[in-house]
Curated annotation (Swiss-Prot):
PROSITE patterns according to UniProt: RIBOSOMAL_L2
Family as reported in the entry's similarity comment: Belongs to the universal ribosomal protein uL2 family.
Sequence ranges of Basic and acidic residues compositional bias: 229-244
SMART domains for this protein: Ribosomal_L2, Ribosomal_L2_C
Any GO CC annotation of this UniProt entry: large ribosomal subunit
Entries under SUPFAM superfamilies matching the protein: Nucleic acid-binding proteins, Translation proteins SH3-like domain
Protein name: Large ribosomal subunit protein uL2
GO biological process, one term: cytoplasmic translation
Key word DNA-binding present: no
Annotated source species: Bordetella petrii (strain ATCC BAA-461 / DSM 12804 / CCUG 43448)
Origin organism lineage: Bacteria, Pseudomonadati, Pseudomonadota, Betaproteobacteria, Burkholderiales
Subunit structure: Part of the 50S ribosomal subunit. Forms a bridge to the 30S subunit in the 70S ribosome.
Length: 275
């Protein structure tokens, strides 16, 4: 994996930085693990826009990723590493000894030909999945379950990881990348190591068209709109905001508290670090 700075042959490509992974599979994905993916374009069931700046983009198939890793004791060989347009991490195609194939999130350092296994007797090696009660304290983990058997929900994006801090009774404490310390049941499963494609955050998109390929539409300033569309809209010629900065629905957008006074999650031991 390497960062490639693109030559400034045009204004759009000036400053563009790509993440190149030469070890990724260049052919088609495994057809049996593909599903249809429809786009909502930010609309709800009434057709109203609920998320702005979404629409268009390249057509994609959803890759069915195994987040449960419940084929215990059956070794699996890594056939290839693949790009997945639906997530920031890369995925790996596993071929189990019984012939079944599954996709998993590719951990850092995983190579084609490696053998992975899951279960309580799996060795502590990157890519293997075990219950948290069988993982040594201090181990770096990713793809962590929040409910036993539900499948991994935490630390799944590129470069993500967590650290197993302690075990107390039926719960363990895990420190996430955000600094949050969270309680997780010891029967929940986690995968050893950290997620690969860790240089993903260093890329530079470079041009607006590349964001349109990803289904992201432009963000229009409120002062450039009409009064019917935004509180900052209207006026003759170029005008300022004429009031405190607000959202299109009138909510102050600079430091205004919007969090509801809801019950605190008792699984959070220590809150994440504030920026």
């Amino acid at each position: 994996m390497a960062l490639v700075k693109v030559k400034p042959t045009s204004a759009g490509r000036r400053g563009m930085v790509k993440v190149v992974s030469p070890n990724l599979h260049k052919g088609a994905p495994h057809a049996a693990l593909l599903e249809k993916k429809t786009r909502g374009s930010g609309r709800n069931n009434n057709g109203h826009i609920t998320i702005r700046h979404r629409g268009g983009g390249h057509k994609q198939h959803y890759r069915v990723v195994d987040f449960r890793r419940n084929k215990d004791g059956i070794p699996a060989k890594v056939e290839r590493l693949e790009y997945d347009p639906n997530r920031t991490a890369h995925i790996a195609l596993l071929c189990y000894a019984d012939g079944e194939r599954r996709y998993i999130i590719a951990p850092r350092g995983l190579e084609v030909g490696a053998t992975l296994v899951s279960g309580i007797e799996a060795p502590i090696r990157a890519g293997n999945t075990l219950p948290i009660r069988n993982i040594p304290v201090g181990t770096t983990i990713h793809c962590i379950e929040m409910i036993p058997g539900k499948g991994a929900q935490m630390a799944r994006s590129a470069g993500a990881s967590a650290v197993l801090l302690a075990r107390e009774g039926t719960y363990a404490q895990v420190r996430l990348r955000s600094g949050e310390v969270r309680r997780v049941h010891i029967e929940c499963r986690a995968t050893i190591g950290e997620v690969g494609n860790e240089e993903h955050s260093l890329r530079q998109i470079g041009k607006a068209g590349a964001m349109r390929w990803r289904g992201v539409r432009p963000t229009v300033r409120g002062v450039a709109m009409n009064p019917v569309d935004h509180p900052h809209g209207g006026g003759e010629g170029r005008t300022g905001e004429a009031r405190e900065p607000v959202s299109p629905w009138g909510t102050p957008s600079k430091g205004f508290k919007t969090r509801r006074n809801k019950r605190t999650n008792n699984m959070i031991v220590q809150r994440r670090k504030r920026k």
